[in-house]
């Protein structure tokens, strides 16, 4: 199977490349600079340009493009950059893949975020059928996903991964969260009762490969633990795993003052479930918060 990656140098893209290379699969990547090897192809998504040769023989394209939501503050120009970087990469990838039709079955695995649903206001979980919220990040994910439509219209099988924070020591959220805990300064965020979506890197990589090889998989999938986990439960699991106490708490007011809107993503209650993955028979290797923390500390990149 031949794969094309956009965003291959980031945390998740690097993990995908390592996994696929270990299996002997063929991987080519899109770069914004002059290509340095025969496995690199240039593109400029902000200008809507892409080297169409990148799609030659490709079975699966994975689009992870987009600048990080951090750093703060979310100024108007930063908001525009966060949105444009996602919509432009997705639109350029989707239109290029659509224009390169060669009669073969092809798949686009498109990144998105669990932030589409906003915070939880009731006891019912968010599923893939739940409507998008109205806040800034929810609007970003809605436009992000819509930008992949040209590929679907051209007959490409499009799988949208609404991903929660992917936990692993090699990068992302967990790499930042574990540092204060290792120093004995870990803390519960807010009152700790808020549900906190997450998935291990090991399971994230498994979902990507499942999406690539499951011919009837299409549309959105929530990537989060099948068992809801609170921030306090995550703190307990991490404290136990690194043999450190949990006695500190960061009040919600301090977080809101320091982080502004982003604080809502950390102290807001988010209850989403991977309904479609479970219904389609996907089996999580790390279904509980204790499993996720253990896997993250071992670092799935080495697996």
Protein language model annotation of sequence segments:
Residues 211-261, 294-303:
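Mid/C-terminal beta-alpha module of Rossmann-like enzyme folds, strongest
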Residues 3-23:
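N-terminal Rossmann NAD(P)H-binding glycine-rich loop of SDR-like oxidoreductase domains
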Residues 178-186, 194-228:
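Alpha-helical substrate-binding/gating segment
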Residues 133-158:
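Active-site Tyr-X1-5-Lys
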Residues 142, 154-156, 167-176, 211-221, ...:
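Glycine/proline-rich active-site loop of Rossmann-fold NAD(P)-dependent oxidoreductases
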Residues 35, 41-92:
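NAD(P)H-binding glycine-rich loop region in Rossmannoid oxidoreductase-like domains
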Residues 152, 159, 164-195:
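NAD(P)-dependent short-chain dehydrogenase/reductase
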Residues 91-135:
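Conserved Rossmann-fold NAD(P)-dependent oxidoreductase catalytic core, especially the SDR/UDP-sugar
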């Amino acid at each position: 199977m031949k794969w094309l990656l956009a965003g291959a140098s980031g945390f998740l893209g690097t993990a995908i490349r390592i996994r696929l290379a270990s299996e002997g699969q063929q991987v080519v990547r899109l770069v914004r600079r002059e290509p340095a090897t025969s496995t690199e192809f240039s593109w400029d998504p902000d200008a809507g340009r892409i080297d169409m040769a990148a799609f030659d023989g490709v079975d699966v394209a994975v689009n992870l493009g987009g600048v990080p939501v951090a750093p703060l503050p979310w100024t108007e120009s930063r908001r525009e950059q966060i949105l444009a970087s996602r919509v432009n990469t997705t639109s350029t990838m989707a239109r290029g893949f659509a224009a390169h039709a060669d009669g073969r079955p092809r798949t686009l695995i498109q990144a998105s975020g669990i932030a589409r649903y906003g915070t939880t206001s009731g006891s019912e979980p968010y599923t893939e059928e739940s409507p998008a919220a109205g806040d800034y990040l929810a609007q970003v994910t809605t436009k992000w996903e819509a930008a992949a439509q040209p590929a679907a219209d051209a007959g490409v099988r499009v799988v949208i991964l609404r991903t929660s924070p992917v936990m692993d020591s090699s990068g992302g959220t967990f790499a930042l969260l574990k540092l204060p805990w290792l120093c004995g300064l870990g803390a519960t965020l807010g009152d700790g009762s808020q549900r906190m979506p997450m998935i291990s890197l090991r399971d994230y990589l498994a979902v990507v490969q499942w999406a690539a090889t499951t011919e009837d998989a299409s549309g959105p999938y929530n990537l989060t633990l099948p068992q809801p986990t609170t921030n306090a439960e995550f703190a307990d699991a991490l404290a136990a795993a690194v043999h450190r106490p949990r006695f500190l708490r960061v009040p919600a007011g301090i977080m809101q003052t320091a982080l502004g809107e982003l604080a809502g993503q950390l102290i807001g209650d988010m209850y989403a479930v991977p309904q479609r993955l479970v219904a389609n028979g996907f089996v999580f290797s790390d279904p509980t918060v204790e499993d996720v923390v253990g896997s993250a500390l071992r670092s799935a990149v080495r697996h």
